[in-house]
A protein has these predicted regions:
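Internal alpha-helical scaffold of NAD(P)-dependent oxidoreductase catalytic cores
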Residues: 93-101, 117-153, 163-203, 242-247
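A short glycine-threonine-serine/GTX helix/turn-capping micro-motif
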Residues: 154-163, 210
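Residues at the starts of beta-strands that form the adenosine-phosphate
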Residues: 2, 24-25, 81, 101, ...
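Residue-level detector of alpha-helix initiation sites
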Residues: 10, 66-68, 227
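Short, well-ordered alpha-helices that flank and scaffold nucleotide-derived cofactor binding pockets
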Residues: 13, 17-21, 40, 73, ...
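NAD(P)-dependent Rossmann-like dehydrogenase/reductase catalytic/cofactor-binding core
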Residues: 188-249
Length: 249
């Protein structure tokens, strides 16, 4: 199956790399210079210029959201599948792109490593549903939300939380350095714990995981009490809410 990615930014590149092992990926951009890095990685590239035919193609919209109107004037024909990663662009806004099936999704840059968590929503006509899931699950875990209004919050959890967790990882590694570890060793331990904890959380409720690690009067519960004292729970919950509120403005 051929997939045409319209855009050449960080997300377009991440998806192209994540998809290349299973699909034939063609990256479409404004100029050869902007596509040079992807071309050097072996991807086929095309220029859309003042007009570009999307007839019967499977396309992924990965350009800047503000460019949607201008791109709609350039694109000709009717796409087969149109998958959009454009922030704050719902199905109604995307109707300016002619396609048989439209899907909105919010992957994150971990798509490059096939580790993205991608919430998505598509028109409920059943058409091409399996193919859309196959495409999105190629670069990680694809999660279909029940209705389109849930995409804003789901997008925050998948797209913004990596930044929140990066702060956590950096803080934990700094704590290790404060206690005497070399920076590289501390960072490696933290990244490893993130990976192993993620696997545990797939089959275990967070509270049960925490309780399984905390021994009475032990070292872990001492640290947990310190986190609770500083309002760690409300800080993270508030961060999600603030990002959500910003996304729907």
């Amino acid at each position: 199956m051929q997939i045409y990615i319209l855009g050449n930014g960080a997300m377009a590149s991440a998806m192209a790399i994540g998809l290349k092992d299973k699909f034939e990926v063609i990256v479409v951009g404004r100029s050869e210079k902007k596509l040079e890095n992807l071309a050097n990685l072996g991807f086929k590239t095309e220029i859309y210029g003042s007009s570009y035919d999307i007839s019967n193609k499977n396309i992924i919209l990965a350009f800047k959201p503000y460019a949607l109107g201008d791109m709609a004037k350039i694109l000709r024909g009717k796409a087969r599948i149109c998958i959009s990663v454009l922030a704050m662009s719902n199905l109604e806004k995307l109707s300016v792109i002619n396609s048989e099936k439209t899907c909105v999704c919010m992957p994150n840059i971990a798509a490059k490593f096939k580790s993205s968590v991608t919430p998505y929503f598509s028109e409920c006509n059943g058409k091409f549903d399996d193919e859309i899931y196959e495409i999105l699950s190629t670069f990680g875990k694809a999660v279909r939300v029940e209705n389109e209004k849930d995409m804003a919050c789901a997008g925050v959890l998948s797209g913004c939380v990596p930044a929140f967790l990066a702060i956590v990882a950096e803080s934990l590694a700094n704590g290790g350095v404060k206690c005497g570890l070399k920076k590289e060793i501390s960072a490696n331990l933290v990244s490893g714990v993130f990976e192993s904890s993620a696997k545990l959380l797939e089959n275990m409720h967070p509270s049960l995981l925490k309780e399984s690690v905390c021994s009475p009067a032990g070292t872990t519960i001492e640290g947990v009490f310190e986190l609770e004292k500083h309002g760690i729970r409300s800080a993270f919950a508030s961060a999600v809410v603030k990002s959500f509120e910003k996304s729907v403005k």
